[in-house]
Amino acid sequence: MPVPNPTMPVKGAGTTLWVYKGSGDPYANPLSDVDWSRLAKVKDLTPGELTAESYDDSYLDDEDADWTATGQGQKSAGDTSFTLAWMPGEQGQQALLAWFNEGDTRAYKIRFPNGTVDVFRGWVSSIGKAVTAKEVITRTVKVTNVGRPSMAEDRSTVTAATGMTVTPASTSVVKGQSTTLTVAFQPEGVTDKSFRAVSADKTKATVSVSGMTITVNGVAAGKVNIPVVSGNGEFAAVAEITVTAS
C-alpha cells in the first residue's frame, strides 16, 4: 500500500472496505486495521454524500423581505452503497447478513489507495443480489449512515513511517517463562503505529501483543522467529528467539 499522501490525486483502484468488530472507539485510530474486518472482492463503492436540509430564515422586516432567505439545517451522511462478488461461504459476507438481521448501528471505514480513510457509522438498510448470465453474481448492499462521519480531510496531516525496528533482535527465554520485544517506528511522531506479530512455530513459542510490546512465551526448547509486519505492509522485521530447557 502506498505511503499515506493526502496532497496528491489518486485513482480508486485499490480501495478497500472494512467493518469494525472491536469494542472500543472506532474513531480513535482509524488508520490502524486492528479490530477491523476487511470485506473481500469489492466491485464498486459509493460513499455516503454529506447533505444538509434548509430552513426558512426570512423575516417580515428584512431589508429584502420579498426575497427568500434560508439557512443550513440538519445534516446527513446519506447512504453508502457497495457491490461485492457474491461468496455466501465467506465470513465477511455472512457477517453482513447478520448485521442486517440484527439491525444495529456499526462502524465501517473506507481505506483509499493513498492510505487515508473515511469512517462512518450506520445500519444495513438493504441487501440483495444481482444475477446475470455472463458475469459473476454480485451482492449489493446499502448502509444508511448515522451521525457525523470522520472524513479523511479531518486528518489531513499524516506523518508516514520511514522505518520500523524490533528490539532486541535476538534473545533467549526459558521454557514456561516469557520475554518481551519492543516495536518502534521512525520517525517518532508516526501517525499509524499498527503492526502484526506472529510466531513462526507455535510449538516452540507463542506471542501476544499489548501496545508496542510483544510478549513471547517459551513453549519448547529450540529456535523460533517472530516476524513483525507494519499495519500497511510497508515494513517488516524479525526477532530470533531461543527457547532453552532451563
Swiss-Prot record:
It holds the Pfam family Big_2. Keywords: Host cytoplasm, Viral genome ejection through host cell envelope, Viral long flexible tail ejection system, Viral penetration into host cytoplasm, Viral release from host cell, Viral tail assembly, Viral tail protein, Viral tail tube protein, Virion, Virus entry into host cell. Residues 204-246 form the Big-1 domain. The keyword Acyltransferase does not apply. Transmembrane segments: none annotated. Its main location: virion. Gene3D superfamilies: 2.60.40.1080, 4.10.410.40. Multimerizes into a structure formed by 32 hexameric rings stacked on phage baseplate gpM and gpL. Does not multimerize in solution without the tail initiation complex. Soluble major tail protein interacts with tail assembly protein GT during tail assembly. Forms the phage's tail tube composed of 32 hexameric disks. When it encounters the appropriate initiation complex gpM and gpL, it assembles in hexameric rings that stack on top of each others. Multimerization ceases when the correct tail length is achieved through a mechanism dependent on tail terminator protein. This is Tail tube protein. The gene is V.
